[in-house]
Regions:
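C-terminal anchoring/interaction modules
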Residues: 1-41, 45-46, 54, 297-527
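Extended, helix-rich architectural segments
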Residues: 1-199
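Short, Φ-rich (hydrophobic/aromatic) sequence segments
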Residues: 68-80, 111, 115, 123-135, ...
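Short, mixed-charge, low-aromatic patches
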Residues: 63-74, 83-89, 98-101, 229-237, ...
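Structured, contiguous alpha/beta core segments that scaffold functional sites
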Residues: 10-11, 16-20, 145-313
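Residue-level detector of secondary-structure boundary/capping sites
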Residues: 102, 106, 269, 345, ...
């Protein structure tokens, strides 16, 4: 089958079109980053102007949004991707035959252990924390690449300012374009198969440490089903790197989407009016405070008082022509108008609104009564309910693609041998993070309540319950690994051994035969 290979000019054109569509979000994202994530703000010319180390909080007067955004990212990470913990489980899908499911699940549990051992060796916990900060604005982007023997996988959180993308079928992100700067001498180190044109090579030899503007493009080949990877030198429009890839290394996640848009809108966009209002109110309060301290004065033009040399400070003597009389004072304070005490009420309301939108509703302080496990679970449940559809989108657009790419890299490096696909039918990714488990525990409680009702209904009720399947379901909901559970074959063997022992006891003590038969009937109904 013929492969699709775009020319460098075509890639640059598509990149410009994608950037033009993204410009519609520039003013919206710019304000969100300026007031809530100023340290990650690249929209105010800091990147284009190549200015590093600049102050980015000149217009920020209140840090409520900054603090709540950080707490939002921390809560999302602890609830969905808890550091140094397992946050998902690989499970056998519906395409796996029932008689092979226990065997497949045991192997997948081993792969799950190896996957999280690999993740712990990487920078995942740091990278996902930074990516979730961008997700609070609306769109986060992460690059998953093979590493070395020490760090098998590298996770790179890319600021979404540098990335433009295109959607394909079913609203999935297919093509990703990234602007990047790299020292000329590092190009061949970054891409060992780079083909540098003569003009660029000469420029690098003269100025090896000067940054080179590059466009990195990952384009989906709709005919072959794989990806084309290009690195283009923007100035000369020369293709430096071209590769074919089985999968895209990009993970692009949107918190929430509006119909007809491809970029996300996060809780910061919702809270932005309150954030800007709070910032302006506090700015006015500070200005009012400075007026209250220093004051504003009127001075008579009498030739004695020189306003340009007057210093308002404790202990200073100001020479004036008069302090009263028919003509009035030479220097007189200008009375202030307005009462800014009401601003405290307004600011408190605005801060509460911002924290509520950003899910920054903390547990009670440590000096209050001890928090029970039930309270923590209920608060996790409330958090998952508040997230709503965003939680499902995070699983589908972030967790599942991440796991898929991690397993593919591990398979390529020989860490595992994975003949199955992560498609939900052969292998499915089941979240076991605290947020997901809070939902599962609701199901477990319902199952156990039903079992209690059945037990109270007597023998007829017990005959309706399949105890072994019930316990399997509870174990799956609680993410109990297959290695500590007996398989169907092992259970059948244990039943046969128990039946033989019961038969032997019945032969030795005939008076117990009736009891054994009754118990066997009861067990048969329950099992």
């Amino acid at each position: 089958m013929a492969e699709m290979r775009l020319k460098p000019e075509d890639i640059l054109k598509r990149h410009e079109i994608a950037l033009t569509k993204k410009e519609d979000f520039r003013s919206l994202y710019d304000e969100a980053y300026e007031f809530a994530l100023p340290q990650r703000n690249l929209y105010d010319g800091y990147y284009d102007g190549k200015v590093s180390g600049s102050k980015k909080m000149n217009r920020v007067f209140d840090a409520t949004a900054i603090n709540s955004t950080q707490r939002f990212a921390n809560r999302m990470q602890s609830g969905i991707f808890p550091p140094h913990s397992k946050w998902c489980r690989l499970e056998a899908g519906t395409d796996i035959p029932a008689d092979r499911k226990d065997e497949a699940q045991a192997a997948l549990d081993v792969y799950t252990e190896k996957m999280f051992a690999t993740i712990k060796q990487s920078n995942f916990d740091i990278a996902v924390g930074e990516a979730l900060l961008d997700l609070c604005v609306g769109t986060c982007v992460m690059l998953v690449q093979p590493g070395d023997d020490v760090t098998p996988i590298n996770f790179i959180p890319v600021p979404q300012f540098l990335v433009a993308f295109e959607e394909g079928a079913n609203g999935q992100v297919d093509n990703v374009y990234r602007r990047m700067r790299l020292k000329g001498e590092s190009i061949e180190q970054q891409w060992s198969d780079a083909k540098i044109p003569a003009d660029l090579k000469k420029k690098i030899e003269n100025k090896p440490t000067e940054d080179v503007e590059l466009i990195e493009a990952t384009v989906f080949d709709t005919k072959r089903g794989d990806y084309c990877y290009h690195v283009i030198h923007k100035e000369s429009k020369a293709e430096i790197v071209y590769r074919r890839m089985k999968y895209s290394p990009w993970v692009v996640s949107r918190y929430m989407k509006v119909a007809g848009e491809i970029y996300g809108r996060g809780p910061l966009i919702t809270a932005l009016p309150d954030i800007k209002t709070l910032n302006k109110v506090l700015e006015l309060v500070l200005k009012n405070a400075s007026l209250a301290i220093a004051g504003v004065y009127t001075a008579a033009d009498d030739g004695v008082l020189n306003p340009n040399t007057v210093t308002i400070a404790p202990g200073v003597i100001i020479p004036v022509a008069r302090n009263g009389g028919p003509q009035g004072e030479s220097l007189k304070p200008l009375p202030r108008s307005g009462d800014f005490n009401v601003s405290q009420i307004i600011m408190n309301d605005l801060r509460m609104n911002i924290k509520s939108i950003l899910l920054d509703e903390s547990l009670p302080p440590d000096n209050m009564s001890a928090r029970s496990a039930t309270e923590v679970i209920e608060r996790m449940k409330q958090l998952s309910q508040n997230l709503g559809s965003a939680f499902g989108r995070l699983i589908n657009e972030t967790m599942v693609p991440l796991v898929e790419k991690i397993l593919q890299i591990m398979d390529e490096r020989g860490i595992i041998d994975l003949p199955l696909r992560v498609n939900g039918l052969e292998i499915k990714v089941t979240p076991v993070s605290p947020l997901a488990m809070s939902q599962n525990m609701d199901d477990v409680q319902n199952i156990l309540q039903y079992a209690q009702i059945v037990q109270q209904a007597g023998p007829e009720g017990q005959m309706m319950l399949k105890t072994d399947m019930l316990l399997d379901l509870v174990a799956d909901k609680m993410a109990i690994p297959q290695s500590v559970r007996n398989s169907q074959a092992e259970r059948q063997m244990m039943k046969e051994q128990m039946a033989q022992q019961a038969q032997q006891v019945a032969q030795e003590q005939p008076e117990l035969a009736g009891q054994i038969a009754e118990e066997a009937i009861k067990q048969g109904g329950v099992m």
